[in-house]
Amino acid sequence: MSAGRNNPLRPASDRRFFPLFKTGVIVPEANTEVFLSSWSSSNESLFDGQFFKVIQFYEIPSGDVKNLLREAGVTLLGYLPRNAYFAAFNQDFNAGMLTGAGIRSIWTIDVDCKLSPDLYEGNIPDHAILEDGTVNVLVNYYSNLDPDQVVGALQGQGLTVIQRDDFGHYINAAVSQNEIRAIAALPFVVFMEPVYPNPEPENYTGRTLHRTNAIATDHGAGRHYDGTGVIVELQDDGIIGPHIDYQGRILDQFLSNNSGNHGDHCAGIIMAAGNVDPLGKGNAFGADLYVYGASPNYPGFSAIPQDYGNLGVRITSTSYSNGCNAGYTTLAQTMDQQVRTYPSLMHVFSAGNEGTGNCGYGAGAGWGNVTGGHKIGKNVIAVANLDYADNLASSSSRGPAHDGRIKPDCAAKGSSVYSTINPNTYALKSGTSMACPGVAGTMAQLFQAYRDNYAGNDPMAGLLKAILLNTAEDLGNQGPDFKFGWGRVNALRAAQVIEEARFDSGSLAQGATKTHTIAVPANVAQLKVMIYWTDYEASVNTTWALVNNLDMTLTDPSSTTWLPWKLSHYPSPDSLNLPAFRGIDDRNNMEQVTLDAPATGTYTVEVVGTSVPQGPQTYYIIYEFIPQEVVLTYPLGGESLVPGESELIRWDAFGVSQTFKLEWSANNGQSWELIAEGLAG
C-alpha cells in the first residue's frame, strides 16, 4: 500500500487519520481488507519471527479489541497520533481474527519517518561527528525485542556499539553517514537521531521563598519535614566535598573526577546542614545523597532501574542541558518511561539559562528555549529561576515545549543562592542550576511529609508533583504561563494539602467518565482544582507528545460548569505572552480550574477519558482552599538572627480585602513596634 505525504487537496474529514511524524504528515490509505486478504510472510522482513507494521484504527481500540489482537498474534506497541500504533505481527498471525476489529489501515513505516529531522535532511550536528568521521546516533528499537539480539544484529551491520540502554530500548552507536538510511530501514529499528550534545552546567533566602523553612521549623511545636530518610540522586560535575555540611549523608559517589564546585553548590541547596554557617542550610537538610557525574550521557539515569530498588533513590536533581528545545527526544521518552514504571520516582531539572535565546520554536528570541529533551518530558519537573522577590531572571528559559505544552513546570529561587563549596565554605551562585536542587530538596521534604502522615508509605510521584504545582504561588500572568509555569513553589501549602488529604484518584479507560465531589467551606478566597496524570511515554517519531488525553470540568453549586485554563501556543511573542483563558486542553497532562471567592457548597469534578490509547489511565485530583487570611511564614520562632544584618519578613495573603500592618516585639509581646502599615494582600 502507499502512505503518501499530506496532500492539501484531501478532504478535511480525513485529517483525524493523519499520523503526525517529525518529518511530515502521512496520509495512509484505508487498505485493511486488501492487506488481510493478500498478505504473505514471504513478503515481510522478519526479525525474531515477527514483522512490524503501523496499524491505524477508526477509533481508539477498547481493551477487548486489544485482547483480540493479542490472541490473533498481534501486539500493539507505541502509540502514534492519530489513532495509530506500531505493532508486532507473529509470522503466523491469524488474519481472519482481525476482520471487524475496527482497523482502517495497515502499512510499513517509511524510512523517512524513522529519522529525526536532522538525519532526514542530512544536517549532522558537529557534536555528533566523531573523530573518525562516523556519526554518533541513538538507535531506538521495538520494546518487545531481546536487546542482545538487536545489538548482535546491529554489530552484524558494521555498527560500533558505544553504549546500550536496555530499559529505554535504545543503543548509542557509531555509523558512517552513508549507512544511516540503511540502518533505519532494518525491520526492528523504530527511530534514529543524533546523540544529544554533551551535558553543560547551567540558601537561605531560597528556603524562606519556597516556604520550606515553614515545614522544617527551628522550634519544637512546628513541622519537622527535613527530608530525613529520603534519598536523592545528584548528577553534576564531579566529586562532592569535603564539607562538614554533608557529614554522614553522602552515601556513595559513582565517579572519580572533580572538575569544579557546581555540584557542591547544588548538593548544598538540596541537603546542606548549615553546620559551619546556618545561612547555608539546604532545603532538605536531613536527606541523603548519591552522586553521579552528568557527563558523558547521564550515567545516573541509566542506573535508575537498579538504584530505585537497590538503593532507594526517589528523587533526582540534574542541572545540565543537552540541546535547546530539542523536542521529544529518546532521553525525554526514557525519563517519562522511568517515572511511569517506578511510580515513586521524580526527575527534577533546571529549565535552562537561554531566556533570551532563539531555539527555533518560531516566535523568535525569548520563547521556546528550554535546554534539553529530558526537560521536555511530560512526567518530570523543569524549574525556572527567580530572585528573592519572585522576579524572573532574564536568563531563565521560557516555554513552550516544541509541541506547545507548558514548560517550565514551576519556579524557585535560583539567583544569588548561598550554598556550599568545598572545602567547608560557601558562595553565591545564580541560574536555573540553583533553582532545580531547591525544588528537588522541597520534593524530598514533601516525600517525608507524606510518609509521616500515611503510615510510612511512599507517595506516588505524580501525586506529589500535582500537589506541588497546584499549591504554587501564581506569578506573572493569571494562571499558568510559559515563564513561571504554574508558579513559585510553596512548601507550606503543599504540606497542608498532604496533611489534610485534599486529593483523590481514579482510573479511566477510553471514553469513560468519572465524577468526584469537593465540599468547599466558607471564607475561601480561592479554590484551586487540578487533575494530573503520569502519562504513557510517547513515540519518539511523532511531533505530539501527549498520549492519553483526559479532560476535566468543575461544576459549582449553581450548576455553572467551568473549563480549565489553557494557553495559546501560536508561535508569536504576542500570542505566547497572553494570559491563560478557559478552554479544552489537548496537549498537557495536567489541567487546573481556579475560582476566586467560591460559594460555599458541593462542587463536582467530571473527568472524561477523551482519548486513552494506552489505558487504563490513573489520575489524581488535587484541591486547595486558599483562606482569606494573612499567614506569617518567616520568621516563625527559634531562628538564629544575626545582629546588624537585614532580614526578609515573608507572609502569604490572598483575597484579604483590608490592609494590615506589621509589628515586632522584643519582649515577648509586652510591647510592639511598627515595621510597616497599609500592606495589602
Q: Model features per residue range: what roles?
A:
Residues 235, 239-247, 385-437:
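Catalytic-core environment of secreted peptidases
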Residues 294, 412-478:
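Hydrolase catalytic cores
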Residues 146-152, 156, 171, 178, ...:
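Substrate-binding/access-modulating region of protease and related hydrolase catalytic domains
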Residues 1-223, 230-232:
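Autoinhibitory N-terminal propeptides
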Residues 525-545:
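Short amphipathic, basic-aromatic surface patches that mediate peripheral association
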Residues 149, 215-300, 311-314, 325-328, ...:
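Subtilisin-like serine protease catalytic core
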Residues 463-465, 516, 545, 554-558, ...:
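C-terminal edge strands of extracellular/lumenal beta-sandwich accessory domains
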Residues 280, 448-524, 542, 580-583, ...:
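C-terminal subdomain of the subtilisin-like protease fold in secreted/lumenal serine endopeptidases
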